[in-house]
Amino acid sequence: MARVAVTVPTSAKRGEIIEIKTLAQHVMETGFRRTQTGELIPRDIITEFVCRYNGAEIFRAELRQAVAANPLIAFTTVATESGTLEFTWTGDNGYLANHKAEIKVV
C-alpha cells in the first residue's frame, strides 16, 4: 500500500495564499541502473501527481526519472471556499495513491 503525507492548513481566510506540501513514499527506480549481474532494473516511478480543490484541478505535475525517491511536492493556491482537496499519485506498475484533506475558509 502506498504511504503518503499531506500538509494542508485546516483553516484559512478567503483569498489567502496557502501552501500545500505532499510526500509520497516511493523508490523512484529510474530504469537506468543495472544489477550486479548486469541486468537492467526496470523503471518504477511515480509519473503524475494531481491536486483537485472541490473537484477543479488546481495543480498537476508530470514526473520523470530524475525525480528523487520519496518525492516532496510543494505548491501554493488561493483559499476560495471551504471544501475538499483531493490528491492523486499515479505511476508505473499500477502505482496509485489517493488522499483527501478538508479546509475551512472563513
Cite the ranges covered by each PLM segment:
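Proline/serine/threonine-rich low-complexity linkers at boundaries of modular beta-sandwich domains
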Residues: 1-2
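Contiguous segments within soluble domain cores/interaction surfaces
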Residues: 5-63, 68
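Extracellular Ig-like/FN3 beta-sandwich strand-entry sites
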Residues: 17, 80-84
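Short strand-edge motifs at loop-to-beta-strand transitions and within beta-strands
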Residues: 71-75
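Short, aromatic- and glycine-rich surface loops/edge beta-strands on solvent-exposed regions
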Residues: 83-91
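Short acidic/polar inter-strand loop motif in beta-rich domains
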Residues: 91-99
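Short beta-strand edge segments in extracellular beta-sheet folds
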Residues: 102-106
